[in-house]
C-alpha cells in the first residue's frame, strides 16, 4: 500500500501515540506526511545519531543502574531494530562513526546509520510490532538527539 488514507493514518497515529511524538520521535505531522506521500520503495532512512554520555533508562528499568553509555544503550536497540528490518526485506546500508563536519554547520552527530526498507509499509509494519516497540526503551535511553532523512536511492 503506497498511499495511506486519512482514516488509516489516524488509526496508526493513535496506535503509536503511547510512545510519544516529537523530540527523538517523529511528530504527528512528519509521520502523516510520510504516510500520505505516495512514495514507495526502496527507501533509505539516513539516521544522524547523537548519544547521551550515560544511558538514561527509567528509574524502574533493570538497566538504570548499569552504567551503560548512551552509545551502548543505543547499540542494544540497534540489534533489535536490525533484526526487524532484515525480517521485512530491508538492510543496513551503512553504519559509521562521524569524525568531523568538514563543510556546513557543526552538528553534534556521533554516528550515521542508513537503513533501507523495501517500502513505507515495511517500515510501518516494523514500528507496529510489539517486539520492536519493546526495544525502544534502549533507543530512548541512548539518544540525545537525532534527525532522520527519508531518501530514495538513485544508483
Q: Residues of each region from the PLM?
A:
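Short S/T/G/P-rich N-terminal loop/turn motif that feeds into the first structured element of a domain
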Residues: 1-110, 118, 122, 152-155
